[in-house]
């Protein structure tokens, strides 16, 4: 198979697998928290990316946890993946897949940087998880922004340390010999 075709197929196969997985993890984070609080899950949709529930008892800790769990579960899974990453593996698919596996959840952290700024400007989307987290936790948007920046930087540092970025770049730049 032509190397360029292999790279493109790896990219599309990775996205085809990882976008639904990210949605499941994001909504799964909300779902797990709701279930822990005694809620009954009424809908869980991958297409449309949402879940709904009835009931449950949320408190000053669990309500902010519910709003942040959609970010935290995918990021936690990405961190575990990074820790188990094998940098010596030379498979083009593995390197592209691994890059995408950490890019999607790590990139979603940026919303938690942008939304607090919008929140301070009175422009945050009312339905956004980060805005709901700020409202329910009572934390300053600056604290949320700083936490998101630190989490984002930590993920980038670990991905760099594990050579995920370098191996992705090597796979993308590689040419048939």
Each language-model region and where it sits:
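Metalloprotease/metallohydrolase-associated module, dominated by Zn2+-dependent proteases
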Residues: 44, 52-172
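Poly-acidic low-complexity segments
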Residues: 4-7, 50, 129
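Active-site scaffold of zinc-dependent metalloenzymes
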Residues: 1-16, 35, 75-79
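Generic preference for well-ordered secondary structure
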Residues: 5-8, 12, 28, 90, ...
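Low-complexity, intrinsically disordered extramembrane tails and loops of integral membrane proteins
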Residues: 173-177
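Small-residue-rich helix-interface/hinge motifs
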Residues: 14-63
């Amino acid at each position: 198979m032509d190397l360029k075709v292999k790279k493109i197929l790896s990219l599309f196969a990775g996205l085809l697998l990882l976008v639904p997985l990210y949605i499941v993890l994001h909504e799964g984070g909300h779902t797990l928290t709701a279930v822990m609080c005694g809620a009954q899950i009424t809908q869980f949709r991958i297409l449309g990316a949402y879940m709904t529930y009835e009931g449950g008892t949320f408190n000053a800790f669990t309500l902010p946890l519910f709003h942040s769990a959609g970010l935290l579960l995918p990021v936690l899974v990405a961190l575990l993946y990074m820790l188990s990453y094998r940098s010596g593996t030379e498979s083009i698919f593995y390197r592209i897949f691994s890059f995408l596996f950490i890019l999607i959840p790590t990139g979603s952290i940026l919303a938690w940087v942008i939304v607090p700024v919008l929140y301070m400007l009175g422009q945050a989307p009312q339905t956004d998880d980060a805005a709901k987290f700020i409202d329910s936790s009572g934390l300053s948007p600056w604290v949320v922004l700083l936490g998101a920046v630190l989490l984002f930087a930590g993920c980038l540092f670990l991905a760099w340390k594990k050579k995920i970025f370098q191996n992705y770049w090597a796979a993308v730049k590689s040419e048939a010999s």
